[in-house]
């Protein structure tokens, strides 16, 4: 789980029967986990015989939380991918080869254009996912599945292509692209891989 280190943060536990319980943060032991994404803290929660308060017996509450989380993850991936695109464009207009900026070469232009063309429609997609939950539309869960899966794929493409535009520099700490590359990779798996959420989407349709 993402690390909510504040002592005031409560922990919610879902039972197999769908019931949700709230546990005081002081009753939970947190163990930090190492992941590929160093920009986010993740921890394992453990508790035994901890006092808990029943919050809900509605199993749908948990799924609605997961769906909302997927929409948020998609928006986070969108932001990371946009940053990588911006960095690729800026680098292509600064880096020179053969006495010309590499952004003037057709191959590099195409790489940047392909990233932009795939990423731009995702803005409206992510916006609608948020709107669907704001308005509690019937297609909100389905939209969350699709936007999570789609942004995972587009984000991976942008991360890979942006790194290629930078050449060998893209893999160095000096540029820092690898932080966002790993962020996108981490988001891809969190709350369900594209394959898993698309399978869920077929069951929702």
Could you describe each region identified by the protein language model?
Residues 50-60, 99:
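Acidic-glycine-rich active-site phosphate/pyrophosphate-binding loop
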Residues 11, 36, 95-98:
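Short coil/turn linkers that connect adjacent helices within long alpha-helical scaffolds
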Residues 2, 41, 145:
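Exposed loop/turn and edge beta-strand positions of beta-sandwich/beta-sheet ligand-binding modules
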Residues 65-205:
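Alpha-helical interface subdomain recognition
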Residues 17, 27, 49-51, 77, ...:
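A broadly conserved detector of short glycine/acidic/proline-rich loop/turn motifs that flank catalytic sites
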Residues 18-22:
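Hydrophobic beta-strand positions in blades of beta-propellers and related beta-sheet-rich domains
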Residues 5, 24-54:
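Flexible, small-/acidic-enriched active-site or ligand-binding loops
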Residues 1-15:
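Single conserved hydrophobic/aromatic residue that forms the stacking wall/gate
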């Amino acid at each position: 789980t993402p690390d909510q280190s504040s002592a005031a943060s409560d922990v919610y536990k879902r039972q197999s029967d769908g019931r949700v319980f709230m546990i005081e943060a002081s009753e939970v032991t947190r163990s930090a986990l190492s992941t590929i994404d160093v920009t986010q803290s993740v921890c394992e929660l453990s508790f035994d015989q901890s006092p808990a308060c029943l919050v809900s017996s509605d199993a749908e509450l948990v799924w609605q939380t997961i769906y909302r989380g997927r929409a948020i993850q998609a928006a986070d991936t969108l932001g990371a991918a946009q940053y990588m695109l911006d960095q690729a464009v800026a680098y292509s207009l600064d880096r020179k080869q053969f006495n010309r900026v590499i952004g003037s070469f057709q191959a590099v232009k195409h790489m940047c254009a392909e990233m932009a063309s795939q990423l731009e429609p995702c803005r409206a997609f992510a916006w609608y996912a948020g709107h669907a939950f704001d308005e509690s539309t019937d297609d909100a869960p389905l939209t969350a599945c699709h936007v999570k899966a789609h942004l995972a794929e587009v984000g991976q493409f942008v991360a890979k292509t942006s790194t290629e535009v930078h050449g060998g520099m893209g893999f160095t700490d000096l540029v820092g692209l690898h932080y966002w590359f790993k962020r996108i990779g981490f988001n891809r798996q969190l709350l369900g891989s594209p394959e898993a959420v698309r399978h869920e989407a077929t069951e929702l349709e």
